[in-house]
């Protein structure tokens, strides 16, 4: 452990002398703790779409509750029935709680996903660095973000990244 501490100290001195940033260090030492944290991509941590069932704009409140309860991400993604995997909305457990609070219980039987979903949620791509996704979640003070849909270049839903996964990976 003493040798490791001396090695770390020498690495820090070398970084400062060379004017290297943490990112430069991470690129040169991807297997180290710092390197791993700074080079992880969203694709390394996201839950892929083939593990998540889509719902549709006309899905009932009962279907939304069932899917959010069945899954392990606290949300469900919404798409058009006629389109491939184009994301048109997202319903989180928070959206669900707000809907139950704001709508008259008599309306619950007729509520559909389109009425409670977040239209145009903030999305990311799988090639984004995970640390950048975390920064995006943290900087949104207006409405806390605990998960981000992941899309490809064709705007198709390919997965979801949870704050929980980022924290488990040591990004906090």
Across the structure, where does each feature detected by a protein language model lie?
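Short alpha-helices
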Residues: 1-19
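Short gly/pro-enriched beta-turn/loop segments at secondary-structure junctions
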Residues: 7, 37-40, 47-50, 70-73, ...
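Terminal peptide-recognition signature
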Residues: 10, 45, 68, 85, ...
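Internal, active-site/partner-interface "lid" segment
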Residues: 16-46
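Bateman (tandem CBS) regulatory domains
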Residues: 38-52, 109-122
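The conserved cystathionine-beta-synthase
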Residues: 54-73, 79, 100, 123-146, ...
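Short beta->alpha transition motifs characteristic of CBS
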Residues: 73, 86-103, 156-172
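C-terminal non-catalytic interaction/assembly regions of soluble proteins
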Residues: 107, 111, 135-136
């Amino acid at each position: 452990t003493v040798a490791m501490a001396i090695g770390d100290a020498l690495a820090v001195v070398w970084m400062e002398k060379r004017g290297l940033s943490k990112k430069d260090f991470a690129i040169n030492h991807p297997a180290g703790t710092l390197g791993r944290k700074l080079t992880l991509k969203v694709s390394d941590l996201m839950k892929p779409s083939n593990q998540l069932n889509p719902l549709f704009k006309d899905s009932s409140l009962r279907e939304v509750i069932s899917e959010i309860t069945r899954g392990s991400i606290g949300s469900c993604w919404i798409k058009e029935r006629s389109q491939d995997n184009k994301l048109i909305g997202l319903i989180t457990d928070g959206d669900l709680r707000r809907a139950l609070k704001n709508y008259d219980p008599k309306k619950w039987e007729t509520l559909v996903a389109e009425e409670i979903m977040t239209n145009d949620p903030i999305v990311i791509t799988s090639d984004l660095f995970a640390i950048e996704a975390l920064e995006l979640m943290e900087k949104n003070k207006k409405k806390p973000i605990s998960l981000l849909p992941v899309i490809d270049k064709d705007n198709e839903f390919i997965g979801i990244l949870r704050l929980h996964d980022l924290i488990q990976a040591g990004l906090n």
